[in-house]
């Protein structure tokens, strides 16, 4: 009971907890990206760490957040067209917390996080609707037959795994051929009627994301909103280990959610994603 009380007490200060988890994910992301443009990052890290160790108690500025933001900005400047989509989300989340460190108004921070989540999820919907390849079901069909989706479930079925390996080998062999030959391959389906299933899955994905975006916009703290949001995150993780992106969405949900049980679920998702990122089982 004592530990449950401590957990509940920790979850009640959801902004502080979300900030700590954000730093955790930031640390993993920055560590993985540290080798990129190191000549710029070394002085930033040196000055940031030196300032944090010696003057953090005498300085009102959030040194850690400023350091992380500058490191993210370096990657953005040099690899604008190559960084992951959630790099932008990470920057805006850090910027929101950085500004919060000065104005100390939770309502402004939570509104910024809410708007960011709505934009991210709604943009994902628009992007999917504008992609003929996605809306036709070709994306899901190709990725499933290659084993890029639902791989963790496919591994439990040896016969399905063999089909995936066969399809992957066919693609590899095709890439080795002269493209002027205009040769082609035909995939073996991992599941019967995978073409129809892919189209259904497309519309289920779009509808769920649209519902979540609308719910976050109008009812950001509702229990039902976060039930749908958490279900969406878990569904994506079951499909593919997009751990970096899902960790950020979960942290955003933690900022807004008032239900202790769902807060705990968000925390578990973030920690799980963090472990998968460190062990390189997930995507950073």
Regions from the PLM with identified roles:
Residues 1-284:
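Alpha-helical membrane-anchoring segments
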């Amino acid at each position: 009971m004592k530990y449950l009380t401590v957990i509940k007490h920790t979850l009640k200060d959801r902004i502080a907890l979300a900030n700590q988890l954000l730093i955790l994910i930031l640390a993993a992301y920055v560590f993985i990206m540290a080798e990129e443009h190191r000549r710029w990052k070394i002085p930033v890290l040196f000055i940031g760490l030196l300032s944090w160790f010696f003057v953090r108690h005498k300085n009102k500025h959030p040194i850690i957040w400023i350091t992380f933001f500058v490191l993210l900005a370096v990657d953005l400047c040099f690899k604008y067209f190559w960084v992951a989509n959630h790099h932008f989300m990470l920057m805006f989340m850090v910027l929101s917390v950085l500004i919060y460190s000065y104005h100390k108004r939770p309502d402004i921070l939570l509104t910024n996080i809410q708007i960011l989540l709505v934009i991210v999820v709604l943009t994902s919907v628009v992007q999917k609707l504008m992609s003929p390849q996605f809306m036709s079901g070709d994306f899901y069909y190709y990725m499933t037959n290659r084993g890029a989706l639902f791989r963790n479930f496919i591994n439990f079925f040896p016969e399905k795994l063999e089909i995936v390996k066969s399809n992957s080998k066919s693609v590899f062999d095709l890439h080795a051929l002269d493209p002027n030959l205009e040769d082609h391959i035909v995939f073996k389906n991992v599941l019967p009627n995978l073409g129809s299933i892919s189209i259904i899955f497309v519309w289920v994905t779009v509808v769920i994301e649209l519902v979540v975006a609308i719910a976050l916009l109008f009812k950001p703290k509702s229990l039902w909103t976060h039930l749908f949001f958490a279900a969406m995150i878990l569904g994506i993780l079951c499909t593919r280990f997009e751990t970096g992106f899902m960790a950020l969405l979960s942290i955003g949900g933690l900022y807004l959610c008032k239900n202790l049980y769902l807060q705990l679920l968000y925390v578990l998702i973030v920690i799980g994603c963090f472990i998968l990122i460190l062990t390189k089982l997930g995507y950073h």
